[in-house]
Amino acid sequence: MRKLALSIAFVLTGLVMNAQVAKIITKVNEAGDVGSFELDCNKGFPTLGKGLKYNITRHEFKGVELKNTYHVMLVMDRFFTKVLNNTMTISAVFSDGTKVSKIETIEDDGYFDGACTLTLASPPELALNLDLKQIIVNTGEKDVVYTVSAQKSNEFKKNLKNIVDAK
């Protein structure tokens, strides 16, 4: 019985340590009118799946009308591809089938370097209320699909909620 209790304690500790809810870094520009809130990725980026990392940033513009912009930077490890066209489409697919897409311009040499930034609505209600299911990269020749697990989707929502609530 004692061994079982210790085993469960180690498993739970491992799960808690593997949860990728990141700290928030706050910055303000010199003029003091733009604040930025982003995940602290100094020790490593949180992941959505094998080879797919992300960072979330919110820019808060002060003035007559307070305005926020939300960006999700996706980094695809070892995703260097030569494409025939000069653009690629990167899409985030949510549980209700809604897509948020970005057309990425390919570098002059014809290679995609594996990084893309998606812009979310302000406030990002869609991403907070629905589960993120897939990231799809359309290279022009084929779709590369990254499936996001329920655990990673929940971690993403927690990180996004922390960015939204950051002061």
Map each language-model feature to its residues.
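Internal interaction segment
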Residues: 96-167
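Short coil-to-beta strand junction motifs in C2/discoidin
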Residues: 82-88
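Solvent-exposed loop and beta-edge segments used for protein-protein assembly and interaction
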Residues: 64-68, 84, 112, 129
